[in-house]
């Protein structure tokens, strides 16, 4: 009985060391992303990209509908890229500090929902910024691109939630 108890204790301490290592890793990545985000803000220039709304107006003279783009906002691009990094920093700091106990509890179940929430925000922001680089400046398109990408990431969370107690991985979340 002593050997079983000793094996359990050594595997528990190995698991605890692994979680402590992940905590330290998240702290390190949090600081790295924070420094990168601050650096990005410091070195970014005043480049902006426009965001427009595009509605149709009826032209009485020509009896036709004509686009009527209206500038809504000038997005400071460097700051927006820095936000991508700062979102990651916040997520890493959360996991290493106030969210650590929940993080460990979820990892033991084979889940990491914070990852998908962070991805839903940060990767959606980055996809929107890439779209803006190639001329997607319509507010409606930007909102939809963000929403579709965020939804795809949240399906990853749904997949982990559904598969935490299954023998075989169910990929249904990604079929939709």
Question: What residue spans do the PLM features occupy?
Answer:
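General N-terminal targeting signals
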Residues: 2, 57-58, 110, 133-134, ...
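N-terminal topogenic module of multi-pass integral membrane proteins
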Residues: 8-107, 113-119
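N-terminal acidic, proline/glycine-rich, low-complexity intrinsically disordered segments
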Residues: 1-7
